[in-house]
From Swiss-Prot:
Its main location: cytoplasm. This is D-aminoacyl-tRNA deacylase. SUPFAM superfamilies: DTD-like. The keyword tRNA-binding applies. One of its GO terms (biological process) is D-amino acid catabolic process. An aminoacyl-tRNA editing enzyme that deacylates mischarged D-aminoacyl-tRNAs. Also deacylates mischarged glycyl-tRNA(Ala), protecting cells against glycine mischarging by AlaRS. Acts via tRNA-based rather than protein-based catalysis; rejects L-amino acids rather than detecting D-amino acids in the active site. By recycling D-aminoacyl-tRNA to D-amino acids and free tRNA molecules, this enzyme counteracts the toxicity associated with the formation of D-aminoacyl-tRNA entities in vivo and helps enforce protein L-homochirality.
């Protein structure tokens, strides 16, 4: 799995004019799923993300997690994180999981986040989504479970 995390003051996902998910202060997560990913991968990544200390403490140092601040998460499925741009000018996506597999693991990932007490808003899997967010920092991190 690959995840792009952005620390946000707010984020909203809209599909066809309808808000499907939102968060106040917290994280926006763009999640990509690979064919070899499993439910265990989803739970491990979720556990890592909710404990990452990317929010400022009283001294201004990044020392608090999304759990610590009582923040929320907006989780968005994004197969394009597995784009291969090495050849030509059109990205290939053969490194991304098949839609059925990715949909199941996206749901598992969101369940794992919720199981750790974090409020989670969601996008709509496979839909064309409009994201509106305010980055905080900005702080943007890239996590890849294949590298852990």
């Amino acid at each position: 799995m690959r995840a792009v995390l952005q620390r946000v003051t707010r984020a909203t996902c809209t599909v066809e004019g309808r808000v499907t998910g939102a968060t106040g202060p917290g994280l926006l997560i763009l999640l990509g799923v690979a064919p070899e990913d499993t439910p265990e991968t989803a739970w491990r990544l979720a556990a890592k993300i909710v404990k990452l200390r990317v929010f400022a403490d009283e001294t201004g140092r990044m020392n608090r997690s999304v759990q610590d601040i009582g923040g929320g998460i907006l989780s968005i499925s994004q197969f394009t994180l597995y784009a291969d741009t090495r050849r030509g000018n059109r990205p290939g996506f053969s490194g991304a999981a098949a839609p059925e597999h990715a949909r199941a693991l996206y749901a598992e990932f969101n369940a794992a986040l919720r199981a750790q007490g974090v409020a989670v808003g969601e996008g709509v899997f496979g839909a064309h989504m409009m994201l509106d967010l305010t980055n905080d920092g900005p702080v943007t991190l890239f996590l890849d479970t294949a590298e852990s």
